[in-house]
A protein has these predicted regions:
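Acidic/glycine-rich phosphate/pyrophosphate-binding loops and surrounding catalytic core
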Residues: 13-166
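Short polybasic linear motifs
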Residues: 1
Length: 166
């Protein structure tokens, strides 16, 4: 197995191709579970070609994680969506910060938003907690490592979040 550098220095013990397959599977499964054959409210109320935008607004301070994952979700749902970022994975954010704006069809934004919010909240919480442990151990020879004890089905993003946190 190769050690590869992915998504802002994320090192894992699988190939880049295998990691990307895991991320793609997480996204496809989550969208299928959440939306199925479509968000019926959006399909009924929002014209197919209606354009829109959204922003990710920070509600608490900590380490932001999952920006690169969010870009992949948006691209999966609608390849033409555009994301304008103001922070990078691993940056410290505080209440009121705007992490990114996303532009695309309103239906596609709504289709992607629940997965993006859930994943980024979880990844940011893990990254923030990891950073606190890393800071506590600064000056020692101790290193924070992740384990295999992760949530089935989303292991790749949880391990990614640990790496982002430190």
């Amino acid at each position: 197995l190769l050690i590869v550098n992915l998504a802002k220095q994320y090192l894992i013990m699988i190939s880049e191709e295998q990691f990307q397959k895991e991320i793609d599977l997480i996204i496809a499964n989550a969208i299928r579970e959440d939306v199925g054959d479509g968000d019926h409210s959006s399909l009924a109320c929002i014209p197919v070609n209606a354009e829109g935008s959204a922003k990710l607004l920070v509600k608490d301070e900590g380490i932001i994680a999952g920006i690169d994952f969010a870009k992949q979700v948006f691209r999966f749902v609608e390849p033409s969506m555009r994301v304008e970022t103001f922070f990078n994975d691993g940056d410290f954010v505080k209440y009121g910060d705007v992490v990114f704006h996303v532009y695309g069809t309103s239906q596609a934004i709504l289709k992607a938003e629940r997965l993006v919010l859930n994943a980024m909240q979880r990844m940011s919480a893990i990254a923030t907690k990891t950073k606190k442990f890393v800071d506590l151990l600064e000056g020692t020879k101790t290193k924070v490592l992740d384990t295999r004890k992760t949530t089935p089905g989303i292991r790749a993003i949880e391990k990614w979040a640990v790496k982002i946190g430190g």
